[in-house]
Amino acid sequence: MVDPNRVQLAKDIQMAQGAWPQARWWVRYQDPQLDRLIDFALARAPAIHVARARVEQAQAQLAAVKSGTRLQAIALGLVNRDHVSSNGFLGAFAHDEPALGLTGPSYSEGIVGAGARYDFDIWGERRSAVQAAVGMRNAQQAERAEVELVMTTNTAQLYFQIQTLLHQEMLLEEAQAIMETTVASHDARASRGLEAGPRVAEQRALLLQLEQQINLTHAQVRAQREILRALIGAGADELSELAIAPIRTSQLGMPATLSYDLLARRPDLQLMHWYVQSSISQVSAAKAAFYPSLDIKAFLGLDSLHLSDLLQHGSRQMNLVPGLTLPIFDGGRLNANLQRARAVNSDSIEEYNQAVLDAVREVAMAGVQLQALAQQEPMQVAKLHEVEVVADSAAAHYKRGLLSRADAATVRLPVITQEAELLTIHGNQIAQQIRLIQALGGGFVSSGT
């Protein structure tokens, strides 16, 4: 299996150090609407209910396997009406000779008592089966945590995609209002013969382009809402009140070291880990099946051929039957079971190793993207500041009557463009932060049980 000391990032991935994500990591964005949405998803999403049902199923299977390691006891009451064949093994009982105690050919046999059985697990076959079932139960618990992590991160991703689109739509509508003012101004100038028709047509084309972008953005919002609704199991009208909210980025650092912590904090890795542990126990159980098995059966009660004699002292019966079985010829069944268990174990180990490498890659990719976005953000803020200076100057000229209203408004368009670029960067930052949170396990910590 992969050495945990290899679970480290490359040295060129430099991020501020931070703590591991908390269990309710999404509260860092200070958005009550997001909090309610994720709580709704965890309570209502079908995928969550399926994962929880699988845990219950695995727990029941573990209880069933454990029961096989304990003393089995039963209480028995039986009435058996027999008609004995005179030509069979019990032919003597088919005769009616009271002097000999025979009242055949029909008898009403009665049995009352208690029986017990115990299997001695000398070679650990049943212990290994229990450990395999424990591994599967723990794997299902880790899978439930993984499903919950995927649900929360996907819900947050979709939510912030919708919020980004809503903010983009708001900027586009602001640009549309400016363009409508500009087109009206150009129309007025053209009607007085102060401006050529092609210039007016050009401005109208830009206005139509903005309207197309608004319609497209609005359609994207509706589509994302439908995807979100299906994901969390919401009804037809339960997301209609999803309102625009401020997009707040937050600082997210990288833990100082990964190593064993990442292996214990990723539910998908714990899922694979428990599959490996279960497969190891299955190999042990398959090996133990080659050895002799010892059990003992006991019965204590009353047995009589005649119901009228059942409660008499002479009807008492006790059986004690120790048993030893050794598989000799089984058609290759035990060897096949062992080979299958070993193959499953080998496959589980390789899948786990690959999952560990993939986990490190996911952390690294999110870290690289956040590094790049952290470098882009101050440059974009500087660009926005420069165009705002130009827009403020134009507004001042307009107030002094040195610039027309339409021209002053048009200068605002580059500001909107740069605000949209900064909005895209912030949306990408949040998306990569959520990917990093998911790659770091989203606050999951293995109990180690």
Task: Please provide the spans of the model-predicted regions.
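Periplasmic alpha-helical coiled-coil/stalk elements that build and connect Gram-negative outer-membrane
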Residues: 142-258, 369, 373, 383, ...
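Membrane-embedded beta-strand positions in outer-membrane beta-barrel channels/transporters
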Residues: 38, 111-115, 159, 204, ...
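Sec/SRP-type N-terminal targeting helices
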Residues: 49-50, 66, 106, 120-148, ...
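Terminal intrinsically disordered/low-complexity segments used for targeting and assembly
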Residues: 1-43, 91-96, 110, 134, ...
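Hydrophobic, well-ordered secondary-structure elements that form the walls
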Residues: 262, 296, 324, 341, ...
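Short flexible linkers and secondary-structure junctions
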Residues: 1-154, 294-298, 317, 328-338, ...
